[in-house]
């Protein structure tokens, strides 16, 4: 009898502390290209745990394949063609890849402003397609979402969350000069030992380098606060019907999911709502398609080199392509090169071109010896995960 009584007491206590699981509705305002690849990993897990995902996808776009998106999709029709969007993106990439490296420090600031204007022009069109669509807004309000997951480099997710009166979370890597982190998220960044993003500096700086870092912060602040953000401040104030700023709304983010990990960063202060999630997309390699596997095996003991410049860089000049191909032809390894464009005249017999490659599966192959990369976050962590040297 005493045993049964004890059981009931324990069972009652268990019920007191038992919390029933609850799934929610999540609205997603994503960015295109590699940002989407990383975000989708998070969304897949959320959906696997029973949460309902609705994603807003601009049309046309760069990388979204609607046939492979297993979530609810709301299409945002843009008043531009895919060709126009591609031309705008190619121009931005051309400036960054071929014009910027040749410019002086001061001239690069002017080019960055030009690139920012072009990028924000595209972002504004995407934002308009959602915010001015009253029918869409009504559907979203009726859906009663619990939270919005957005990318701060693709403005408007935070504005949409504000209109729907729901909290929002950011998935983020970095911004130029760490502007968004410093000014909007209020992240402490002493210029004496915290190198600004894209500065190329480390946390161990000489006096001159500290001065350079400080100037980067100042110039970035001026460029964004006085030349790029004001248009968005005015836009957000108009939509919300009250004076506000882009940074003020961004600062309301409940959490910032940083797509890197603390052991791969220089040490500097972080806030409690910054969470490192780098490498979430990493996974064991799957078997390669037959044609790829045969080419990889033909490399013998020398193995293979995987070469890719990511999902966006597709505008290498003919001259640069030939220089790279000529260099690759001189190494003993077989090379798998993710490449779009005219076949280089100097392409060696050891190199094959592919418009797409299973990057993670190749990096996890036992015959892979090195990874030539533009240092995109996804590729870096896949190479670390599989233990592959990077160039």
Set out the residue ranges of the language-model regions:
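Conserved, non-catalytic sequence blocks in retroelement Pol enzymes and Pol-derived host proteins
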Residues: 244
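Glycosyltransferase specificity loop/lid
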Residues: 2-238, 257, 264, 276-286, ...
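Long, low-complexity segments enriched in small/aliphatic residues
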Residues: 249-266
């Amino acid at each position: 009898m005493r045993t049964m009584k004890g059981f009931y007491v324990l069972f009652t206590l268990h019920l007191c502390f038992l919390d029933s699981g609850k799934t929610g509705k999540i609205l997603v305002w994503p960015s295109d290209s590699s940002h989407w690849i990383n975000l989708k990993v998070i969304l897949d897990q959320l959906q696997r745990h029973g949460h309902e995902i609705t994603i807003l996808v601009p049309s046309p776009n760069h990388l979204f394949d609607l046939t492979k998106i297993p979530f609810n999709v709301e299409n945002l029709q843009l008043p531009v063609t895919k060709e126009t969007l591609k031309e705008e993106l190619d121009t931005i990439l051309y400036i960054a890849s071929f014009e910027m490296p040749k410019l002086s420090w001061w001239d690069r600031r002017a080019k960055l402003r030009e690139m920012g204007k072009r990028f924000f022009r595209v972002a504004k069109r995407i934002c308009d397609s959602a915010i001015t669509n009253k029918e869409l807004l009504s559907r979203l309000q009726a859906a009663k979402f619990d939270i919005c997951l957005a990318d701060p480099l693709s403005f408007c997710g935070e504005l949409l969350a504000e209109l729907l009166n729901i909290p929002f979370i950011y998935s983020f890597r970095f911004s130029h000069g760490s502007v968004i982190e410093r000014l909007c998220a209020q992240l402490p960044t002493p210029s004496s030992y915290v190198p600004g993003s894209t500065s190329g500096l480390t946390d161990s700086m000489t006096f001159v380098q500290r001065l350079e870092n400080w100037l980067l912060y100042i110039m970035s602040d001026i460029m964004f606060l006085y030349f790029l953000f004001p248009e968005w401040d005015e836009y957000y104030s108009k939509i919300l019907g009250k004076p506000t700023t882009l940074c003020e709304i961004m600062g309301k983010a409940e959490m910032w999911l940083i797509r890197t990990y603390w052991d791969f960063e220089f040490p500097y202060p972080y806030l409690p709502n910054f969470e490192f999630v780098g490498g979430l997309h990493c996974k064991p390699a799957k078997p390669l398609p037959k044609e790829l596997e045969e080419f990889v095996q033909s490399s013998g003991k020398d193995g293979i080199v995987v070469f890719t410049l990511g999902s966006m860089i597709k505008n290498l000049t003919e001259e640069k392509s030939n220089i790279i191909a000529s260099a690759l032809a001189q190494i003993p390894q077989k090379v798998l090169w993710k490449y779009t464009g005219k076949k280089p005249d100097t392409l060696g017999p050891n190199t094959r071109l592919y418009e797409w490659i299973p990057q993670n599966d190749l990096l996890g192959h036992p015959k892979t010896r090195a990874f030539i990369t533009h240092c995109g976050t996804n590729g870096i962590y896949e190479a670390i995960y599989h233990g592959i040297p990077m160039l």
